[in-house]
Structure formats: C-alpha cells, structure tokens
C-alpha cells in the first residue's frame, strides 16, 4: 500500500528552509539575552476548565469577579493589530485566547510578542474578560516566551495531507489535527474502561515476558533476536497465552494482561506487526461465559469512549447495544456467501474436493503448506474466510472451530473434532478469539506434536513444542476459559478509523530516505 501523496513543490521546501533559518536567528538572539528556554512557569488553569466555569457569565459579571489566571500552551493563532494583538494558545485540554496591548502588557512585551511565531509555547498571567464579540480571553498583564518553535506548522487550510508524513511525524499530526487527538483520547478511555471492568470482575493484572525462548500461544511467524548474556536465540512474543495459563496453574484463577504482541507478518489497513492485545483467563468458566463477558466488555468500552453503543463506522450504523449473533462456520458460509456471488448447499460444505475447487476459483492455493494436507474443518474455515468473513458487519461470534486449527482449545464432549472456540467479528474484522482452554496435558502434548509435523512440512506459522508448558499442565489446571481482544482493531471501530495506522501512535513504516 502506498500512502504517499504528491511531494511538496521545491518552492515550498525552499520557503520552509528560509523560515527555519529566520527562526534560528530569533533563537540565537534569545540566547544572547538570557535564558532562552525558561522552566519556572506553573499554570493554574486549563483552557477547558476556564470555558466550563466562565463561558456562561456575561461580560459585566466576569469583570466584577476579577478572575486571575496563569495559562500556557502552544500558539496556534496570532493577530497583530497596531497597539493590540490576539493569540490563541492550545494546551492539552483545548484552546483559549490571549489579549495583549501596550497598556496592560507593556509596550516592550507587546513589541517582543510581535516577533514570536506560530508554534511557540507562551505563557500568560492576567484577568479573564470577554471581548465585544463575547469570546472568553485572558488580558495579559504578564506574557513570556517559554519555548521557541524552529519549524513552521502546516497551514490550517491545507493541514497535514500526506498520510506517510502524518504517521511518521505523529507529533505534527497531533498538533494540527484535533481529530487525531480525539482518536487517541478515545483509545485511552477504551483501554481504561477494559482495565476497570476487569478489576471490577476480580481479575488480577499481570505482566509476562516479552522475550520468549520458544514462540507460542498463537499460530504466527515470530521476530527473532539474540540474548547476548545467555548466548541463546529468543523470540519476541506472539502471544502471552502460555505464560498466563501457567499463572492459572499456579493458583491465580483470574488474570489479565494488556500489552504488545509481535508477529513478523504483513502490513495492511488492519495489520501492524506490533500490536496491542488484552488477554484474560478465568478458572471455572467456558467459552459461553467468555462470549457473554466479552460482549459486555466491548459494549462498555464503546460507551466509555464515545458515550454510546450505537456508532457510525465508515458511513454505516454499527449497533453494539444488541445481542451479538452466534453462528457456526458453515452457518455463516450459507448465510453470507450470496454477498460474494456464491450459492451453496449444506451438503457441498462436507465435500473436500468441492471446497478446494472453490478456494482455487477465489485465488487461494489449496496446495499451500497450510492447506495441502488440511482436513475438512480447515478447508471449511478457509472457505468461510474467502466468502463470508468480510460480510460480518454486525457483531457476530463464529463458534465451534475444528480441532486441527485450534491446537490450544478444549475439544467438545459431544462433537468429536470440534472445539469450544469462538472468534468475534465486527465490520468484517476479527476482534477477539477465545475458547475453553485445553487442560489435558497428554492431549496438549499430542497436539503440539502434530504442530511440529506441520512446521516440518513447511507451515511457518505452526507452533513449537513447549515442554515447560506441558510440565505446568501436568501439575493440573482447573477448567478455564481464555480470550484475547485486539485493542487496535477495537479502537478502529470506536473511532471510525479506516486504517489501523490511524489508531497506533507510531505505526511501522519503511525506513525514511535521508
């Protein structure tokens, strides 16, 4: 995917270099005159609080109260009009206007202000008042330059239009785009909501290793590194699952972790090699309990982040307030295949040769290492991913996955070959994956052996055999349910973001050309 728009014209680059040179000269003069970057100003108020408390007062009421404030922020608007000037500053909460004139601020201070630039950090001390137009402002009796900006901000009309620059220079994006700031505030609120609800449900938050001697807990290709002191190969974790289940073995019956995972795979609008997940495990629960609990978590996160569970995503309504539907893989294929221009009978979905032919028509390679020796369950899953997955707009649990693609999930007591597993899809994206955990050490060891066979046959994403995890299970693990929720994709839903890079502060990009 190419995020680049047209490069800036040469004249714009020349103009920017000229502006930077001028600002460096101003900074040099500041250094000559004393402390160029003072660090002794402490604000007493934030912009949002001033507006909340005093916007409703009339000009006369505000003047009578004589509210004295100290405020600081980045100058994002400047108007010089002879003996009076206005500046709008932006702090972490919002914006407020400064009023500067010769009489109140002093002619020398006002004169110095005229040479300050957009992007500079400035502080003001003075009384609140309202202009003739009714705008709440600070009448500056004391005004200072706190930090000089050497680079010009993008102009407010064109903004930051180049997507790669937006992602690479997120600091500029956050300065000039309130939408981006709101996105990451919503992300923070959503994560805080998840954490709060986990703690309220008596889960304990833990931290497990990021460097693993054996990659495990998911089927994915890991990043590889080397531990110099121990002289051993290590892997950035692809999932914390096996460590969290070790903690359940150890007696922590409800645990969760919010942290990074790393998978050495492709980059796309819905994939970033470094991503955030929340995984949680609860003893004496199963996948049905997990589905109910996860549904409540996501609904609460939406309300806490955006104030409602009924959202708009990419121009369509997304209602998280209604019960999430639950379908098996085959039920989903039959229900949604028409939206991919297909029509199937239920009996056809038990025909491996038929499914292989359909996969080939859809551009898939049925002879790939993943599918070459696949059983009917894995083939059905591949067909689901081809013709149904992208059409699951409303929240949908796909349940009862085949055992051959679920090496860590408990097998159903009544349906051999089927596991008690679900994946949650919303707007055609996988958001969560959970299951009743396999706690039979001998069964788990046999499944690891089959994974090793698949890896030896060319499947790079197949799991390794983790002997220590088997040893942990041999001490006994209670019946347990576990689930992982993709935080980045969840935030995409909550903030109407079309690309996962829009919700990650510093997404992965190609190396910048010097």
UniProtKB/Swiss-Prot annotation:
An example Gene Ontology CC term for this record: cytosol
Transmembrane segments: none
Cofactor(s) required for function per UniProt: Mg(2+)
Main location class: cytoplasm
EC number: 6.1.1.6
Subcellular location: Cytoplasm
Cofactor details (free text): Binds 3 Mg(2+) ions per subunit.
Binding site for Mg(2+) 2: 430
Residues at which Mg(2+) 1 binds: 423, 430
Record key words, sorted: Aminoacyl-tRNA synthetase, ATP-binding, Cytoplasm, Ligase, Magnesium, Metal-binding, Nucleotide-binding, Protein biosynthesis
Molecular function (Gene Ontology), one example: lysine-tRNA ligase activity
CDD domains reported for this sequence: LysRS_core (cd00775), LysRS_N (cd04322)
Catalytic activity: tRNA(Lys) + L-lysine + ATP = L-lysyl-tRNA(Lys) + AMP + diphosphate
One GO-annotated biological process of the protein: lysyl-tRNA aminoacylation
Record's keyword annotation contains Repeat: no
Keyword rRNA-binding applies: no
Description of how the protein assembles with itself and partners: Homodimer.
Family indicated by similarity: Belongs to the class-II aminoacyl-tRNA synthetase family.
Name of the protein: Lysine--tRNA ligase
Native species: Polynucleobacter asymbioticus (strain DSM 18221 / CIP 109841 / QLW-P1DMWA-1) (Polynucleobacter necessarius subsp. asymbioticus)
